[in-house]
C-alpha cells in the first residue's frame, strides 16, 4: 500500500485531465515568463548604468504585458489546481463511502466510527493540502530547471556554485521523509482514537448523563488527548528540525553566490546587470526550493493520510456476492442445514442448527438473551456467512444468490428500530421510495402509527431527527414495522416487532400481521408469548443450540426450557414482603452514597470552564506568554531576513562599484552570519510554536468537550451531535492551526511591511509614492475578497458537519440500508452533501484565484514603475545602482508579505468560522450553575407542578399540565399508549430536559437549583436507548460506579438475572464489548443496563421500558429484583407490559401528555377506564393457553 499510494493518488488526479492540463499548462507558461523577467531587469539596469539614454518605454511595455499574462496564468493555475484538490477529495470521500456501503457484518464489526470520521475528514484534508500544490510542483521544478539554464547562460561558475547544495538538500529531505512518515502515521492513529472517544461519548450521551459520568468521559478524552499530544510533539520536533534547515541551505547558497558574483563583477568578468540578473534568478529559485522543501513535509503527512484513506477504500466484504438471481415469483422457504457460526474463530455462537421453514409457514424462534436468535436473523439476511453448513432460501444456498435479489425478497423488522434523518413518510417508504402517499398511509395504518402521525402539524412530512431519537421507542418501532410491511416481502423476518408498544396496540398489530403473513413465509424472533399466536411452529434456542421444534402445544409438552422461558411471572406479592426484609436494602439515610462517592472522578485543570462572557478568548489568554515568545522569535527572524538587501546594496556600491573588495567580503560574511542566526531563531520559533500549539489544542479540545458534556440533551438533537463532534475535532484544530501558522505569518508580514517601508523611505522617499499608488486598489480588492469569502467559508463549514452526520448515520444504520437495498439512495444523499461541500470549496478557490494573482499583478506594476523611474534617477546620478537594486529587492519582499497576508486570511476565515461555532457552543447555557445547591441524600419525594414540555422539533406538546405528587419510597408505574409522554416524564425527573413551563421538585427543591451531576449520582436509570461503551462486560456494568469490586459487579448481575447470560459469553465478565454493544443482542444489553443501574444503589430508581427485550422467565427474575430494589426507595417505571403494574403502589395512566387516571391497580380496574382496557388486553396476550390466545378488539 505504502509503495503504490502515490500511483493510486495520481490515478485519482488523472480523472480530471482537463483541469490538470490547464493547471500545468498555466504553470509552465507562467514559469517561463517569471524566469525571463530578470533578463529584462538586467537590460534596464545595464542601459541605466551605460547612461546612453536608450528608450526604456519598450521594456516598460514588456514588463506590463508580462505582468498581465502572469495574472491570467496564475488565476488559471490556482483555480484549476485548487479545483483538482476539491474534486479528488470528493472522489476519495465518495469511494470511501461506497466501500462502507459494501461492508458485510464482519467489516462493520471491525471499523469504529472514530476511524471512519478521522479518515474521511482529517486524513482527506492532509491529502487535499498536498493536491492544492500539484500544479506548483511542476511550476517549481520547471522554475528550477529554467532558472539553472538561464543562470548557466549568464555565468557558468556562478551556476555551478548555486547547484552544489542540491545533493545535500536531497539527502536531508530523504531522511526527513522517512522519519516524518512514521511520526505522522502514528499521530493520525492517535487522532482517530481521540475522535472515537468523542463519538462514543456523543452517541452514549444519555447513559453518560444518566449516571453523572460527564467528568469521567472528559478524563477519557484527556487521556487519549495526552497520547495524541505526545505523538504530535514528535512531529513538531521533526518539522522544527528539518524545515528551517531545508530553508536555510538555499540562503547560504545565495550568500556564496553573492561573494563570488560580486568579486567577478568587481574584476569585470561579468557586468553589474548580469550580477543583478543572476541574483534575481537565484532569489526566484530560492522560493521554489524552500517551497519544495516544505512540500516534502506536507507530502509525508499527506502520504500517511492517503495510506489510511486508501485502506478504507480497499476494505472489502468477506462474503462474495452470488451470481444466481432468486426466483421473483415463487413463495420462499427458509432452511438452516447444520449451521454453525462464530463471530470469532473457535468461539461458536450457533452450533449445528438444522431448522426449516416451509413456504407460507410462520415460525417463531424463542430463547433467552444471548441464545443466538439475532445471529440467526443476520445469517438469513446474509450479513454474515456461516462457518459451517448452509442457509437456503427457496431451496438455493444464499451464497449462490445475488444479494440484490435475496434482499429484495426479505422484509426486516430489527430489534433496534433504526430510523434515518428525514420525514416519517420517507422512513416508512425507505424500502419503496416510489410508494404513493396512499400506500404509505396504508402501511402506517397497519402498524397503528397513523393516529399519532395525524396529530402532528406536518403529518407524514414531520422530520424525525437524527436516528429518530425525538420519537418514543414504540413510535420508532411502529415506523420500522410499517417500513417492512410496505416493502411487501415474500419472506418477513421480525425481531420482537411489538416489544415497545402497549397491549391494546399490540393486539391491533397482531390482527394486521396475521393477515399480512397469511400468504408469505415469516420468521418471528420473539420473547413475548403473545406473538406465538401468529406461529404455525415454534423453535427453541438455548446457548446456540436448537432444543426443540414443533407446534406450540407440542413444544410446550416436551420442552422444559420452553416452559421455563414462557412461564408467566409468578405472583410477586410475596416478593414485596421479602423485599421489606431483604439485606440488600439499606435504610433510606444510606441510599445513594456510594454512587456519589465513586463516580466523582476529578481531573483538574484541562477541562475547567473559563468564566466570563467570552470563554474562548479568556482561555487563549492563558497562553499569552508562550504565544508572545513565539511571535517575538518570529519578529527577530523577520528582521534578520530584512538585512541581506542592505548588505547587497553596500556590497554593490562599495565593493563592486568602488572596487573595495574588503567591503564585499564583510558584507558576504555578515549576510552568512545573518542567515545562520535566522536559522537558529527559526528553529526556536518552530519549537515554541509547535509546543504551544499542541498545548492550546489539548486545552481547547478538553474545555470544549467538557462543556459539551454538560449541555442538555436538546443540544444533541437533530444534527447537533454531529456538530458537536465537528467542534471538538475539526473546529479546534482549525483555530490552533491558525495560531500556529497563520498568526506567525501575520507577524512576519506586518514586521516585514513596516521594516521595508522604513528602509524604502530611508533610501528614496519619492519612489515610495509610486508604490502607494497601488495601495487603494489593493485595499478595495481585499475588502471585496473578505466579504465574498466569509459567506462561503461559513456555509462550507456547516456543510462539512452535515457530511459527517450523514456518514455517522449510515455507519450506524448500514444493516437496515442494506436490508432494504437503499445503498444507492444513501450514496446519492451523501453525494449531494459532499458535492455541496465541494462546490463551496471550489467557489472559495475561485475567489482565492482571483485575489492572490491580483496582489502579484500590483507588485509587478509597482516594480515596473520603480524600475523605470529609478533607472532614470540612476542616469541622473540621484541614486546609485545599489540603491535601485535594493529598492527592487525590497519591493519583491514588500508584496510577498501582502500576498501571504491575503493567503493567511484564508486560514483566518476558517479559524474565524470555527471560533464562532465554538464560542456559540461555549456560550450555550448548561443545566448546572455555579450557585447550584449540592445534593446530599435524597428522601425521594417527586412533585410535578403544572408541568408542560415541548420538544424543539415538534409543535405538539409532549406534556400538558402534569400535576402529580409522588411520596418518598413509593413505586409508581406509568402506563399509556406509545407517545403519550411517559418517557418524557422520566427524562424530566432525570433532568435530561427542563420543563417548558412549570416545576419538577424533588424533596421540595426545584431540580434547576440542584447541582446536576450530584443529583444524577443519586439516580439509577435504565433508558430506552441501551448503550454501552467499548470495554469488558464488567466495565459496562460498573460504568456508574467505576471502583466497584468484581464481587459487587457479579452480585448486581445476579440480582437482575444477568449472570447466566454473562457466563455464557466468551470470557464471561471479561468479554469484550464493542462501542454501542453492536456484538450483543438487545436483551443482553438490557440486562447489562439493569445491572448497571442496580450497582449504583440509587436513591431514586427510573426504569424506562427496562424489560421489553427480555423473555417472560428472565423478565420475572428482573421484576422480582426490581421490587426488591424498589422497596423503601422512590421508583418510577414506564411499562407497556403490565405484569409489574399489578404490584406497584400506584399506577398513573397518561394519554396525549395528560394524566387521565391515577390510582392503585384494583381501583383502576374497578373504574373501567383506560387502564381496565389495557389490563384486559394484557391478560389476553399473556394467557397460559397459548394455542387459544385471541386478541381483543382494540
UniProtKB/Swiss-Prot annotation:
Keywords: Antibiotic resistance, ATP-binding, Cell inner membrane, Cell membrane, Membrane, Nucleotide-binding, Repeat, Translocase, Transmembrane, Transmembrane helix, Transport. SUPFAM superfamilies: ABC transporter transmembrane region, P-loop containing nucleoside triphosphate hydrolases. It is found in: Cell inner membrane. It is a multi-pass membrane protein. Its EC number is 7.6.2.-. The ATP-binding domains (NBD) and the transmembrane domains (TMD) are fused. This is Multidrug efflux ATP-binding/permease protein Rv0194. It comes from Mycobacterium tuberculosis (strain ATCC 25618 / H37Rv).
